[in-house]
Amino acid sequence: MKIVVMSGGLSPERNVSLSSGSMICQALRERGHRVALVDLFFGMEGRGVSHPEELFDAPIPEQFKTVSPQAPDLAEVKRSRQDQSASQFGPGVLELCAMADCVFLAMHGTCGEDGRVQATFDMLGIPYTGAGYLSSALALDKDMTKQLVAGRPGVTTPRWETVDCAAEDLDAILTRTALPVVVKPLASGSSIGVYIANTQEELRSALEHSRAIGGRTVLEQFVKGREFSIAVLEGEALPSIEIIPKAGFYDYANKYQAGATEEVCPADIPAQWEQRMATSAKEVFRTLGLSVYSRADYIITPDGTPYFLEINTLPGMTPTSLVPQEAAAVGIGYGELCERIIHASLEARKKGE
């Protein structure tokens, strides 16, 4: 097959996405596919080619291969684009994608998971991997996701409130918020901008940071327990993975700094706990209208109750990322997983999903 792997983009998670993209590209090439790797935002800039077709044979650039433990400076990223266009699509990107049998979306965060790229491709008739535009948009919005799944069979969620830090009085929010509380941007991943506030001072600092980056913020009940992630692949749950940070919680630095977190897969938990979490994850998947694959995050309390936190429609896809680890636990190798995602996605697009 002729495949474009799309990564990067103008997202706080672009570095993670670039790394996912490079690994997917390499794995698919090793399985005999013609694969072009492209950064959504920069397109053909700096790739040393004169026509998009040449990217199918181009080497993988070094800057795609590593994940910085620091989130990127997006203002600097924007300034470094030569054409200074306001378009999210870099030069030659759409022309390149139109040449492919499928576009593998290795995007993460608002640029790629919010449904806009999917809607564009639907309009242009370009097949792509993962969920469709509407379910992608719903899943990225933490408040909308919680509203839709709270109370569904088998799904338990922490209490939450969504506030607009840019418009509301911070003192009023401080007064009514019970501590400890988890502070999350409404639409982001990789735990960027996530804080656990144990004091009024910590909460104020977190809210001020949220105000600076956009405003709409989810305040979520802090649930004490063990942290897990569980993937759904083609409607069926994979074995869960327990996440054990060596310090703090599973934030951006702990996710992408080597040795900062222990990950145990399959998770060493009672079968009943595993079944409850799998049932919940599949119900969330169905309720949001997702297709192909996803990864959901949970806290399980000491009594075995799984609390659903959020879901990722385009989870990290390096060989050591959570979903590939879970797939490997049932004998699905990394390259095979990438191919299964492509074939399932092509079927989903045919069905209009």
Residue spans for each PLM region:
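Conserved metal-phosphate-binding beta-hairpin within the catalytic cores
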Residues: 221, 230-232, 285-317, 327
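Active-site "cap" helix and flanking loop/linker of ATP-utilizing ligase/carboxylase catalytic domains
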Residues: 242-294, 325-353
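Active-site nucleotide/adenylate-binding loops and adjacent lid/helix of ATP-dependent enzymes
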Residues: 3-7, 19, 90-97, 122, ...
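Hydrophobic beta-strand scaffold residues
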Residues: 35, 127-128, 157, 181, ...
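Phosphate-binding site of ATP-dependent enzymes
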Residues: 195-279, 300-307
